């Protein structure tokens, strides 16, 4: 198990963590202090936990009174949310979701938008809070609805402790965020439809850890621009997997560290571009277990629609301590195919052991990629890299043992009925203890 170095300076202080982070993450003031300053219980503003009455106006009124220096409290119970929420301009605020917000209408873009918020925390105090999207009502017919969450222009923040269930589209989007901690979260939904990304994140200095995802598209995905991310203890349990991209013009991604990734029928690395421009550099994927997935380790610079321009420069990627297998040997277990106009370089595969669930050989495919390991060519001078394409057939079975998680799904969840909200998981990677324990508060702020 990879040793993690972290220090808690005080109950109310942000956390300092090692690896790729560039500074402290999390709220500047703890939720208990905010609750002592002022608490706005939504039932005092007319909210009724009957699963029918729209709770939106009560939440907006509570936010208006407590969004500066206070805590908004959603007590246990099921509340119908028939209003798209825009929670904006929060300053030193906390939102404690101990009940269930159930989508009660056909909305437009996202059910809950948190924007322009500094020193804020969105969390469940009893670790039983959830947002129920009833996405099956759309998805069973091949249609899509609104996203569940968007956090936009948020800094010095944390999001933790609740479940996002059955979204009609994307689950959680983190748009231009900084100095954040995202952890102890569960995403559970239909696993056979795209456009249902669980976590799409771009920004600076973000720690994502202890996450479980079941969905039909990407699990934890880094978008551009992004820098100084630590992503660890990730359990993609029937999902598209962890990815970077897709990328376009002006790409700027650097200093991203993935570690302790567990993939059940999911891909651990899919870096995808098709032309575009800019740079991706200094990325590490280490301590990875893959059980199934079409492309467990893939860099594909001819993916999807051609967005024009000269190509994205990809450099200094490290893949270390990988174990597992893909679903079919008709697809390369290792695929590193870079743009012929801007070849990749400084790519390192160190102790990568990937086999297949189907057959007695695997393929490796490399194109215009330089470094060490698999089918990569060595570069003597990165200033003048020739184009090439090569494929290697491997028949020698690697010697390794890759643990299975007891919670692995073997069949897709049903797509024609509401999801039961499961309890929060307590394990996200074999042998790794979650970094932060689940909260078990009673009442607002645990006071």
UniProtKB/Swiss-Prot annotation:
Instruction: Provide a GO biological process annotation.
Output: cell wall organization
Q: Which family does it belong to?
A: Belongs to the glycosyl hydrolase 28 family.
Q: Which residues cross the membrane?
A: none
Report the protein name in the record.
Probable rhamnogalacturonase C
What does the record give as the organism's lineage? Answer: Eukaryota, Fungi, Dikarya, Ascomycota, Pezizomycotina
Q: What InterPro entries does the record tag this protein with? A: Glyco_hydro_28, Pectin_lyas_fold, Pectin_lyase_fold/virulence, RHGA/B-epi-like_pectate_lyase
What organism is the protein native to? Answer: Aspergillus flavus (strain ATCC 200026 / FGSC A1120 / IAM 13836 / NRRL 3357 / JCM 12722 / SRRC 167)
Cystine pairings recorded for this chain: 40-66, 219-236, 338-344, 366-375
**Which residues have a glycan attached per UniProt?**
37, 65, 237, 252, 316
- Chief subcellular location: secreted
Where would you find this protein in the cell? Secreted
Gene Ontology CC: one annotated term? extracellular region
């Amino acid at each position: 198990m990879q040793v993690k170095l972290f220090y808690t300076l005080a109950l109310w202080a942000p956390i300092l963590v090692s690896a790729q982070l560039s500074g402290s993450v999390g709220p500047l003031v703890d939720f208990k202090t905010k609750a002592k300053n002022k608490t706005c219980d939504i039932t005092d503003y007319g909210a009724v936990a009957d699963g029918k009455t729209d709770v939106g106006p009560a939440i907006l009124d509570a936010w208006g009174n407590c969004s500066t220096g206070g805590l908004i409290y959603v007590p246990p119970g099921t509340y119908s949310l028939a209003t798209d929420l825009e929670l904006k301009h929060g300053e030193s605020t906390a939102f404690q979701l101990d009940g269930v917000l159930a989508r009660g209408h056909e909305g437009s873009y996202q059910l809950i938008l948190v924007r322009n918020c500094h020193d804020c925390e969105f969390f469940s105090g009893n670790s039983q809070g959830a947002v129920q999207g009833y996405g099956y009502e759309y998805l069973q017919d091949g249609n899509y609805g609104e996203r569940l969450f968007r956090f936009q222009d948020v800094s010095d923040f944390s999001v933790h402790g609740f479940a996002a269930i059955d979204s009609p589209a994307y689950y959680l989007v983190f748009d231009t965020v900084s100095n954040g901690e995202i952890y102890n979260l569960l995403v559970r939904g239909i696993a056979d439809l795209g456009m249902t990304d669980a976590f799409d994140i771009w920004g600076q200095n973000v720690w994502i850890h202890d996450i479980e995802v079941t969905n039909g598209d990407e699990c934890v995905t880094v978008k551009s621009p992004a820098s100084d991310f630590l992503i660890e203890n990730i359990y993609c349990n029937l999902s598209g997997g962890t990815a970077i991209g897709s990328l376009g013009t002006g790409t700027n991604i650097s200093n991203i560290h993935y570690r302790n990734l567990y993939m059940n029928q999911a891909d651990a690395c899919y870096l995808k571009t098709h032309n575009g421009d800019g740079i991706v550099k200094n990325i590490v994927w280490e301590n990875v277990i893959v059980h199934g997935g079409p492309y467990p380790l893939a860099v594909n610079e001819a993916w999807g629609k051609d967005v024009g321009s000269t190509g994205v420069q990809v450099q200094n990627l490290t893949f270390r301590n990988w174990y597992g297998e893909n679903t079919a040997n008709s697809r390369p277990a290792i695929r590193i195919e870079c743009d012929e106009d801007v070849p990749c370089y400084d790519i390192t595969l160190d102790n990568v052991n990937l086999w297949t669930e189907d057959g007695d050989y695997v393929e490796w495919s490399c194109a215009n990629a330089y470094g060490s390991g698999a089918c990569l060519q060595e570069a003597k001078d990165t200033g003048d890299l020739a184009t090439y394409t090569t494929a290697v057939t491997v028949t020698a079975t690697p010697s390794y043992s890759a643990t299975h998680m007891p919670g692995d799904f073997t069949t897709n969840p049903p797509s024609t009925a509401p999801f039961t909200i499961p309890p929060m998981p307590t394990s996200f990677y074999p042998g790794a203890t979650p970094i932060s324990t689940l909260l078990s508060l009673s009442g607002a702020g645990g006071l």
